[in-house]
Amino acid sequence: MAILKHIASKSSNYGAALEYLIFKHDELRKTPILDQNGNRIMRDEFYLDGLNCEPYSFDAACQQLNREYQKNKNKNEIKSHHYIISFDPRDSTENCLTGKRAQELGLEYAKANFPGHQALVCTHMDGHNGSGNIHVHIVINSLRKLDVPKQSFMERPIDCKAGHKHHPVSYTHLRAHETSLHLV
């Protein structure tokens, strides 16, 4: 079974999310791992996709949208949401979960739960501190880019409109969807 974690961020540095996703990090020090020349080291294996943006220009796309709608200007505003879906390490062997399949599940999850948002979806194979559990990171701009049809979990009429902020809905909805992730 998968576990869902949510982190809200007030940082306006959207590029930091991409850097964390594609480069190796020292989890204890919370810093990038550098080679002997001082360059960041790419992760050994990851899958990366963007929704409503190109993944490698996520930061610029989010900043542009924020300027367009004049949102996310206050330092105390939540500017992005980071969701992590962690699979049990046994899912790799018992359910034949692969990085590719986890990425597909992450994309499905992001499209269903964060429609209209710019998002990065990235699967890591290594797990926290080398635990080996496959996990998917979903980082969304808190500002919705596109109008979308109203979903049953959207609590306010504006929750489906472009230019409005992500409203963290009842986690009951997200957790219900989390348990419905079909591995095979």
PLM feature spans:
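N-terminal nicking endonuclease/strand-transfer module with a His-rich metal-binding environment
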Residues: 1-175, 180, 184
